[in-house]
Design a protein with these regions (language model features):
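Active-site neighborhood of HAD-like aspartate-dependent phosphohydrolases
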Residues: 1-43, 54-57, 61
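Metal-dependent phosphoesterase signature
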Residues: 54-90
Length: 167
C-alpha cells in the first residue's frame, strides 16, 4: 500500500516551460551558440541543465557549466516567476495530505528555488519535505530522492510504499 508520494516540480506541480525556455535561450545567446528549435528547448525541462547543455548544444563540460551560471542570471530574478501552478494542484495536495499520505517534493532544481516556488504556490504546508539539489551539485535525481528518503526516515524496506509522480 502506498503511504508516501514524491512529486517532481517542473512539469508536474507547475508549468515552468516559459521561464526555463526563456532562460535557456538567454544563456545560449550570451554564449553565442546556435539556437536549438523549440522542441529541443523543451527537452531542457526536467533533467540537470549541465547535461542538457552538453547533449542539446554540444557544449563541453566547462561551457555547459557556464551556461548553467548564465541561465541562473536570468532564471533566479525573472524566470522562476514565469511559472504557474498546475490547475487544482494545491487542492489535490491538501486532499492527499488530509487522507494521511506523506507528501514530499524531489526535484533536481536547486533546493532554494524549490522552496521559493513551493511557498509561492502554497504547496509547502502539504509537504513533509521540499528537497532539491544542493548548491553546487549537478542535480542528480537519484541523489535527490535518496536525500528525501533520508529526511523522511525511510529505508530500502519502505520502497514498496513510495510512489514517485513525475520524472
Amino acid at each position: 500500500m502506498i503511504h508516501t508520494v514524491l512529486f517532481d516540480l517542473d512539469g508536474t506541480l507547475t508549468d515552468s516551460r516559459e521561464g526555463i525556455v526563456n532562460s535557456v535561450k538567454y544563456a545560449i545567446e550570451k554564449l553565442g551558440g546556435p539556437m536549438p528549435d523549440q522542441q529541443t528547448l523543451l527537452k531542457f525541462i526536467g533533467p540537470p541543465l549541465q547535461d542538457s547543455f552538453m547533449e542539446y548544444c554540444g557544449y563541453d563540460a566547462e561551457t555547459a557549466a557556464r551556461g548553467v551560471d548564465i541561465f541562473r542570471e536570468r532564471y533566479v530574478p525573472i524566470g522562476q516567476y514565469e511559472n504557474m501552478a498546475a490547475p487544482g494542484m494545491k487542492e489535490l495536495l491538501e486532499r492527499l495530505k488530509a487522507r494521511g499520505y506523506v507528501l514530499a517534493l524531489a526535484s533536481s532544481k536547486p533546493e532554494a528555488l524549490c522552496i521559493s516556488i513551493c511557498e509561492r504556490f502554497g504547496f509547502t504546508p502539504s509537504m513533509a519535505s521540499v528537497t532539491g539539489s544542493p548548491a553546487g551539485s549537478n542535480g542528480d535525481k537519484a541523489d535527490v530522492i535518496r536525500s528525501v528518503l533520508d529526511r523522511l526516515g525511510l529505508t530500502d524496506a519502505d520502497l514498496s510504499t513510495i510512489l514517485m509522480v513525475g520524472d
